[in-house]
Amino acid sequence: MRGKCALLYHCCTMRVVYVLLLGEMSGMSFEIGLAQTVHPKDGDVVGMVKRYAEQARMYGVDLLVFPEALMTPFEKTPEEYRAIAEPVGGAFSQAIAEYAKRYGIWILYTMLEEAPEGKQPYNTAVLVDDKGKIQTTYRKTHLFDTDTIQESERITPGENLHIPTATPFGKIGIGICYDLRFPELARNAALEGCDVMIYTAAWLDGPRKADHWKSLLRARAIENEFFVVGLSRCDSGYLGRSLIVNPFGEVIEETGPIMDLVVATIDLEEVAEARAAMPVLDHVRNDLY
């Protein structure tokens, strides 16, 4: 049986949505929290992370996810990006690692990672465990160069796909925003054993943007028969509307364009159930493509 019940919690800083997905819970489930944020007016991003971590711990979250462009707004010059960037493990990373350890939760966040001298920084996702130890990083590989924005003016692209990371709650795959439009990244993660694919994003609002966001997230879940999580920031001009899709392509939680902490129970047995019913990955023709 698949379904849900919801408890809404309102406070002055954020709205918390708690969703329980009904089914057989046998140690294969975990709590995921999506921190749909805006940049704080006072610029205290670390303080904001602390507040979300405190709330997440109250709701028993195992993995707390923050959106793309957490460290600083996108709307800065290339020179400002280079000045803000830090190495992974620098002061920004250390502060978040401390909160992960203090509240006993895993945290996935993004930062501007220093690149070799003369290069623009990387747009990097970092996964830190509940002991404050960095378990994996991923540098965004597909940069958003379009008719209106040239991300490559600010960011250096990564050169490697993310290999799903083993955690106490399954193998976690990571993509960043525009990566969602490239199904090869998700398929590679699936073939590497991914259970939950997380896209952390600053998805722009505008014509067709919401439809593309939802359709692409559902498609990635259906194609690969794993959970897909899409988290977008919700500042002015950005979409918000974060959602979670199960391995059958069903949207099991979706929020609006406001600050939220969405907490959901993900049952990994649904991955095995979907793949047993229709073993798509077993039918991939690697000899042809």
Where are these regions (language model features)?
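Active-site catalytic loop in hydrolytic enzyme cores
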Residues: P116-E192, D205-S215, A219, A277-V280
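CN hydrolase (nitrilase-like) catalytic-core segments centered on the catalytic cysteine
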Residues: V88-L108, K171, R181-V262
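Active-site-proximal beta-strand elements of phosphoester/diester hydrolases
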Residues: S29-K41, V65, T124, T137, ...
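Short, Lys/Arg-enriched N-terminal segments with co-localized hydrophobic residues
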Residues: Y9-G27
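Cationic, low-complexity basic patches in intrinsically disordered or flexible, solvent-exposed regions
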Residues: C5
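Conserved hydrophobic/aromatic positions in well-ordered beta-strands
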Residues: G33, V126-V128, L243, V262
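A short C-terminal boundary segment appended to hydrolase-like catalytic domains
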Residues: A272-Y289
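Cys-nucleophile CN-hydrolase/nitrilase-fold catalytic domain and related Cys-dependent amidase chemistry
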Residues: K41-V46, K50-K131, T137, L204-I222
